[in-house]
Swiss-Prot record:
It is linked to Deafness, autosomal recessive, 32, with or without immotile sperm: A form of non-syndromic sensorineural hearing loss. Sensorineural deafness results from damage to the neural receptors of the inner ear, the nerve pathways to the brain, or the area of the brain that receives sound information. DFNB32 is characterized by prelingual, progressive, moderate to profound sensorineural deafness. Some affected men are infertile. Its EC number is 3.1.3.16, 3.1.3.48. The lineage of its organism: Eukaryota, Metazoa, Chordata, Craniata, Vertebrata. This is Dual specificity protein phosphatase CDC14A. It comes from Homo sapiens. Changing I364A: Inappropriate nucleolar localization. GO terms for cellular component: centrosome; cytoplasm; cytosol; endoplasmic reticulum; kinociliary basal body; kinocilium; mitotic spindle; nucleolus. It is found in: Nucleus; Cytoplasm, Cytoskeleton, Microtubule organizing center, Centrosome; Cytoplasm, Cytoskeleton, Spindle pole; Cytoplasm, Cytoskeleton, Spindle. The keyword Cell cycle applies. Changing D251A: Loss of phosphatase activity. Interacts with KIF20A, which is required to localize CDC14 to the midzone of the mitotic spindle. Residues 396-435, 487-560 are annotated as: Disordered. It holds the Pfam family DSPn. Transmembrane segments: none annotated.
Length: 594
């Protein structure tokens, strides 16, 4: 009893006599008065190089589900609940981030209050997070930065755990399923660059432009911005009704002022969502999306880096971090001017596009054609060759290859829904779960084609199974993946290939993928006491053939006169059967007006 009291004396208190966070050397046993739990081996970050966090949005969601369930449990109602972690600096930082995020989302604490609680007690300082580059860390992202990013995302409606679909998030973030994430729901989708033909190359699944069409059309993606050199014909997107723009700059580098202006102009004049890609969809992609969010939502550089990495781990790398820090003041000024002119302009005089055309003092360029060819700017001859590594591949190539080595995640039992037969909002092509007998046979398919074992230079941290007691069916080979492969992985220029892609509920034909996968003004000094890191209503129909069912009637939430500044929700829904508190702070439905 004395030992137990001693542990709590040094613990961080989040709810008096109820919720604590502690760093312990040994694994404690729960007692009559205290319940201990840890997520150190359950929610594990998948690193690229020396990066180790923050944990992604799906893991934040799973943690909140877990903690809400414990706090609502009748058997634990009279006990103190202690989330404990070990002295491993990386695991400890991620554990602290999770309980801090919970405090911000559910306990209505400010990021500063939550961070202050983490610093209380006898806890040592926390290791800051870093980027996913190969070299030394030159930019520290603190836990406080991450909590502030969560708070900003919550305020602006970038996520809502009442409607978040964790299975969908984890499905589409995987390389074989498209490798994309929403950064601003209904506005920005970050994805890995398409290739001329869907195939597996050196163990890495590549997707043709056509593979993305059903999902893009279903979720109102109207424009595609390419930041890497041309490897597929833009005509393939434009012929399908999408606008396509080329804004090339070198892999791992920072964009010129001209590129930033043109990107902002495109985004401010585009109705609908914009899909942005470079090679891996991490560095260049995250940097330009960050510029827009800093301008229109007044995120600080640290807040937006944190938010984008929580949505899409590994984003914004090396000098790109410092670039955003330098650009923060000017982007804020541009945003203030933009909002001032938008506010003073009578709404009856025309649309936002007409207003934008008069903002000459903001140095926004003129209208761009649907297909913006870099030859006009003399930049088409630029290539990523300047930054190739000794083995002939670029930073983006390496990051994509590392990501492709990740093992499929087995979902924890608490994440499964009672309405598994319903289609996901991001993909209605998953009307059922495969039976255990089908799973058994699927495992034996041609998995040898995929390079799943980590390289000697960069070992991957594989996720461990999160199920603690219940037998959980494999998420990686459910029917959603089966059906979506017909769209995401079998689309090529070859007519025969197109014929073989199936949208049937009961099965799908064997493409290379189906065979494989059935198995402020002045930047503030950030001196914290640390050491040296979707609008989608769930579809109730169960037609599992494709990804392009019509969007739901949710868009009424968006304010019509500021559509480019408000995210809408077209896809992160979940069932009411989840273990979630229904007392989410009201700030989730409030927007901040600057």
């Amino acid at each position: 009893m004395a030992a137990e009291s001693g542990e709590l004396i040094g613990a961080c208190e989040f709810m008096k006599d109820r919720l604590y966070f502690a760093t312990l050397r040994n694994r404690p046993k729960s007692t009559v008065n205290t319940h201990y739990f840890s997520i150190d081996e359950e929610l594990v970050y998948e690193n690229f190089y020396a990066d180790f966090g923050p944990l992604n949005l799906a893991m934040v969601y799973r943690y909140c589900c877990k903690l809400n369930k414990k706090l609502k449990s009748y058997s634990l109602s009279r006990k103190k609940i202690v989330h404990y972690t070990c002295f491993d600096q990386r695991k400890r930082a991620n554990a602290a981030f999770l309980i801090g995020a919970y405090a911000v989302i559910y306990l209505k604490k400010t990021p500063e209050e939550a961070y202050r609680a983490l610093l209380s007690g006898s806890n040592p300082p926390y290791l800051p997070f870093r980027d996913a580059s190969f070299g030394n860390c030159t930019y520290n992202l603190t836990i406080l930065d991450c909590l502030q990013g969560i708070r900003k995302g919550l305020q602006h409606g970038f996520f809502d755990f009442e409607t978040f679909d964790v299975d969908e998030y984890e499905h589409y973030e995987r390389v074989e399923n498209g490798d994309f994430n929403w950064i601003v729901p209904g506005k920005f989708l970050a994805f890995s660059g398409p290739h001329p033909k869907s195939k597996i190359e050196n163990g890495y699944p590549l997707h043709a432009p056509e593979a993305y069409f059903p999902y893009f059309k279903k979720h109102n993606v109207t424009a595609v911005v390419r930041l890497n050199k041309k490897i597929y014909e833009a005509k393939r997107f434009t012929d399908a009704g999408f606008e396509h723009y080329d804004l090339f700059f070198i892999d791992g580098s920072t964009p010129s002022d001209n590129i930033v202006r043109r990107f902002l102009n495109i985004c401010e004049n585009t109705e609908g969502a914009i899909a942005v890609h470079c090679k891996a969809g991490l560095g260049r992609t995250g940097t330009l999306i960050a510029c827009y969010v800093m301008k229109h939502y007044r995120f600080t550089h640290a807040e937006i880096i944190a938010w984008i990495r929580i949505c899409r781990p590994g984003s914004i790398i090396g000098p790109q971090q410092h670039f955003l820090e330098e650009k923060q003041a000017s982007l804020w000024v541009q945003g203030d001017i933009f909002r001032s002119k938008l506010k003073n302009r009578p709404s009856s005089e025309g649309s936002i596009n007409k207003i934008l055309s008069g903002l000459d003092d903001m140095s926004i360029g003129g209208n761009l054609s649907k297909t913006q060819n870099m030859e006009r700017f003399g930049e088409d001859n630029l290539e990523d060759d300047d930054v190739e590594m000794k083995n002939g591949i670029t930073q983006g190539d390496k990051l994509r290859a590392l990501k492709s080595q990740r093992q499929p995640r087995t979902s924890p039992s608490c994440a499964f829904r009672s309405d598994d037969t319903k289609g996901h909002p991001r993909a209605v092509s998953q009307p059922f779960r495969l039976s255990s007998s089908l799973q058994g046979s699927a495992v034996t398919l041609k998995t040898s084609k995929m390079a799943l074992s980590p390289s000697a230079t960069a070992k991957r941290i594989n996720r461990t199974s999160l199920s603690s007691g219940a037998t959980v069916r494999s998420f990686s080979i459910n029917s959603r993946l089966a059906s979506s492969l017909g769209n995401l992985n079998a689309a090529t220029d070859d007519p025969e290939n197109k014929k073989t892609s199936s949208s049937s509920k009961a099965g799908f034909t064997a493409s290379p993928f189906t065979n494989l996968l059935n198995g402020s003004s002045q930047p503030t000094t950030r001196n914290y006491p640390e050491l040296n890191n979707n609008q989608y209503n769930r579809s109730s129909n169960s037609n599992g053939g494709n990804l392009n069912s019509p969007p739901g009637p949710h868009s009424a939430k968006t304010e019509e006169h500021t559509t480019i500044l408000r995210p809408s929700y077209t896809g992160l829904s979940s069932s009411s059967a989840r273990f979630l508190s229904r007392s989410i702070p009201s700030l989730q439905s409030e927007y901040v007006h600057y």
